[in-house]
A protein has these predicted regions:
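Helix C-cap/helix->beta junction micro-motif
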Residues: 334-335, 455, 494, 537
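Conserved core of the PLP fold type I
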Residues: 178-334, 346-366, 372, 528-529, ...
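Conserved PLP-binding active-site segment of the aspartate aminotransferase-like
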Residues: 393-394, 469-479, 495-531, 550-555, ...
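N-terminal small-domain helix-loop-helix segment of the aminotransferase-like
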Residues: 105-225, 276, 280, 285-289, ...
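Amphipathic alpha-helical coiled-coil/zipper oligomerization segments
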Residues: 1-103
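Hydrophobic residues in well-ordered beta-strands that form the structural core
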Residues: 246, 268, 341, 419, ...
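Conserved core segment of the aminotransferase class I/II
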Residues: 105-119, 297, 361-442, 446-458, ...
Length: 624
């Protein structure tokens, strides 16, 4: 029976591989057509530019060389574009070229990638995804910081790992009661996981998620990590080129998890930092934003099969309230969307002022057959090297589909036993581990946020997870992702690794994620290196601003009614009549960081030179 199953599985996988290879070949051909189109269009316009230059030299009246038909040139360019476009459309693969749809070759593509003759098209595609996501980490792994062996190495504040509780976990996991070898643990298990482990997981989640009713082991599946669960759910819930809806910024590994094997896309509901009347916090997720993203995707012919929620949210650290969760789930039900809720940081809420609410806590789920909850030990138990992920769902069809991946992504028997013993010891978890872990997380978080406050760097002050979402936009020369990557590389050159906002699909350049769940001495050194980069960057920007200001003052005289109030580089300049106190303070903070500003500038001098600005400033101060 087992041999027949393996043969059937092998044939199915072979069919899938062949279909995937054909799809990737067609996709590559489409990319080649688009590239050829760009080259041809460039060629045409280069010829047109040459013609115009000849015309300027030969005719001072018309500026166009005689006997040259520009209309014909434009017509030829249009025909080439239309012809190439039609050929590309003939190879349409259910993909639309939109920045809302993340494809395998989208944000993950590296221009310097060299395809391998030893790999298939699909293999090269997987390599592109892998190498691009590992950029920076390759450098880090070759030059890791070590207090004794390599003190000048790179400090990793980019990988979301808890490095504060190794002492507690190593002591616990090496206890004699944690180690058992018996025949059943060395044999093939139920692909969903050993029953005794699933029972323990059900009891654990019932207690810590404050489930409305006892959870059942029959609804639990175990795979080797939450990444494997995302990959399996993508394969089970979506066909190739279909999509999940997710709010940005989000943990970028999900893109790879759903696309690498399943070729499933992500549709982005972009969140922004602006606080409006309908929002109470930066980057707040609303049903309206989900609805707009869904409608935009549907208008482009993309079939969205589910919604992914991260709670607590990575990288923001937000915790959704029960009412917010209810709204999101009801939205999904109206549109018949599955909901995957990632609660991997469930026990990493380290401040009593914040309260986590699990989806499992809800008395009645709007659509229980389409609601699936993920959790694992890697974050909450500071054990990212232990690959143990759990899925809880009431949908038995999903259970069967995901369970088939246990053959490829199962967890070894001895490790299942060890984790069951860990989850069973509730006294140790509550009285020893969680108490110490939360104290250490809070202390580390306080250290980093105090440093950021000293630097005058804005950030989201949250009490969940291992990360802080930091606003470095004022340190960008321009509000572009190219400038963001330049700043990211400057951090790396200074031997500190951070995660740029672009890797989380953030819509606003200049945001970074920093991991604080580390020892204080490493955090201190890492923050020193960050501070050095920011000071150098700010000094260079200020010098450039001074040069530009001197040049603009010498070239033109500006009417006082249109005078620009200087604000942070990431903000739009506003007229003096609509400036805010925050804008003016931003100006003062930037200027005062230069060493001689206070000596060269006085209140009286400022009032005399810029009376309109000084008047606005005085009125605003009087209102505070």
């Amino acid at each position: 029976m087992e041999e027949r199953f393996l043969q059937m599985e092998e044939r199915r996988l072979q069919r899938d591989l062949e279909a995937e290879e054909r799809r990737i070949q067609l996709e590559q051909r489409r990319f080649e057509l688009e590239r050829d189109h760009d080259f041809r269009m460039f060629n045409v316009f280069a010829q047109m530019l040459s013609i115009l230059r000849q015309g300027n030299q030969g005719s001072s009246v018309t500026g166009v060389a005689p006997n040259v038909d520009l209309n014909q040139a434009f017509s030829n360019a249009t025909e080439i574009g239309e012809r190439m476009s039609e050929e590309a459309k003939a190879l349409h693969l259910g993909q639309t070229r939109s920045d809302r749809i993340a494809s395998v070759h989208g944000s993950c593509y590296r221009a310097d990638f060299q395809s391998s003759p030893y790999l298939s098209v699909r293999g090269n595609s997987a390599s592109i995804v892998w190498t691009s996501s590992e950029e920076g980490y390759e450098v880090y792994h070759a030059d890791k910081y070590d207090e004794d062996k390599n003190p000048s190495g790179i400090i990793n504040l980019g990988t979301s790992e808890n490095k504060l509780c190794f002492d507690l976990m190593s002591k616990k996991l090496t206890q004699s009661s944690m180690n058992l070898i018996e025949p059943s643990l060395l044999q093939y298990p139920d692909w969903k996981g050993h029953l005794f482990v699933r029972e323990e997981v059900a009891r654990f989640l019932t207690y810590y998620s404050k489930a409305a009713a006892p959870l059942k082991a029959e609804n639990v599946i175990l795979l080797n990590g939450c990444g494997s669960l995302f990959s399996a759910l993508a394969m089970v819930l979506c066909d190739p080129d279909e999509a999940f809806l997710i709010a940005t910024p989000f943990y970028g590994g999900i893109s790879r998890n759903v696309s690498l094997c399943g070729n499933v896309k992500l549709v982005y509901a972009y969140l922004d930092s602006q606080v409006t009347g309908s929002c109470t916090r930066p980057f707040q997720l609303t049903v309206d934003k989900l609805k707009k993203a869904l409608q935009d995707a549907q208008s482009e012919g993309v079939k969205v099969r589910g919604l992914i929620l991260l709670n607590p949210q990575n990288p923001l650290g937000d915790i959704y309230s029960l009412s917010e969760l209810q709204d999101y789930l009801e939205f999904a039900k109206r549109h018949e969307l599955h909901v995957i809720v990632d609660e991997i940081y469930m026990l990493s809420v380290f401040d009593d002022s914040a309260t986590f609410h699990s989806v499992l806590e809800m008395d009645r789920l709007p659509d229980p057959q389409r609601t699936h909850v993920i959790w694992g030990v890697s974050k909450d138990f500071a054990a990212s090297g232990i690959r143990f992920g759990t899925l809880y769902t009431l949908n038995q069809d999903v259970i069967k589909g995901v369970a088939s991946f246990g053959y490829l992504h199962g967890i070894c028997g001895p490790m299942q036993y060890k984790i069951a013993q860990l989850l069973r010891d509730r006294d140790w978890i509550n009285q020893v581990y969680l108490r110490a872990n939360h104290e250490r997380l809070k202390a580390a978080h306080t250290f980093v946020t105090d440093e950021l406050k000293t630097l005058g760097v804005p950030f989201l002050n949250r009490s969940a997870g291992f990360f802080i979402w930091i606003d470095f936009r004022k340190y960008l020369r321009k509000g572009t992702f190219e400038e963001e990557m330049i700043l990211w590389r400057r951090f790396l050159e200074k031997k500190v690794l951070l995660s740029p906002g672009n890797s989380f699909e953030c819509n606003e350049p200049g945001w970074f994620r920093i991991i604080f769940a580390d020892k204080i001495h490493r955090l201190r050194l890492g923050m020193q290196r960050i501070c050095e980069v920011l000071e150098e960057q700010e000094h260079e920007i200020l010098n450039e601003d001074k040069d530009q200001l001197c040049q603009s003052e010498s070239e033109a005289t500006v009417d006082s009614t249109d005078e620009v109030i200087f604000v942070s580089h990431h903000q739009e300049p506003t007229s003096s009549g609509s400036s805010t106190l925050g804008d003016l303070i931003g100006l003062l903070q930037q200027q005062m960081r230069s060493s001689d500003w206070l000596q060269k500038n006085t209140v009286g001098q400022f009032a005399q030179e810029k009376p309109e600005v000084y008047d606005v400033f005085s009125k605003l101060v009087g209102k505070q």
